[in-house]
């Protein structure tokens, strides 16, 4: 799973995804991409599940780029623990995805296979998405 090698701080604020994406809104590598419509927090496990679904559909042909990286540590307290006594320990990593952000890109497969792969990857993510394509 994706996780940063080093961190400046062990724990992070919860934060919110408020504005539209400022960068990463256009296709940079592939011909087809998966663009977010909502702003939400996507975990490393969800990214990995989407990657596996897409590569399985593509039968390991072509190329898949993941344009997001989970760099925000999400902390959690154990079950049945009373309030207070500090913040919980970091459990997993997530990325805050803004509306308009390209998350996955595909190149080197037929159009119908690429669209199907991105649909399968989209089903694994908690954000509403749409498929975009490069017109040349």
Curated annotation (Swiss-Prot):
UniProt keyword Chloroplast, yes or no: no
Biological role: Binds 23S rRNA and is also seen to make contacts with the A and possibly P site tRNAs.
GO cellular component: cytosolic large ribosomal subunit
InterPro entries in the record: Ribosomal_uL16, Ribosomal_uL16_bact-type, Ribosomal_uL16_CS, Ribosomal_uL16_dom, Ribosomal_uL16_sf
Quaternary structure and partners: Part of the 50S ribosomal subunit.
Family: Belongs to the universal ribosomal protein uL16 family.
Species of origin: Rickettsia prowazekii (strain Madrid E)
Protein's name in the database: Large ribosomal subunit protein uL16
């Amino acid at each position: 799973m994706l996780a940063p090698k080093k961190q400046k701080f062990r724990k992070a604020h919860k934060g919110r995804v408020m504005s539209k994406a400022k960068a990463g809104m256009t296709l940079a590598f592939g011909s087809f991409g998966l663009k977010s419509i909502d702003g939400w927090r996507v975990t490393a496990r969800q990214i990995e599940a989407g990657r596996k679904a897409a590569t399985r559909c593509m039968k390991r042909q072509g190329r898949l780029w993941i344009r997001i990286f989970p760099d925000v540590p999400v902390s959690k307290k154990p079950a049945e623990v009373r309030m207070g006594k500090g913040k919980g320990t970091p459990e997993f990593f997530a990325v805050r995805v803004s509306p308009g952000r390209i998350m996955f890109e595909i190149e080197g497969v037929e159009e119908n296979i690429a669209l199907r792969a991105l649909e399968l990857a989209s089903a694994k993510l908690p954000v509403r998405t749409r498929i975009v394509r490069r017109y040349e």
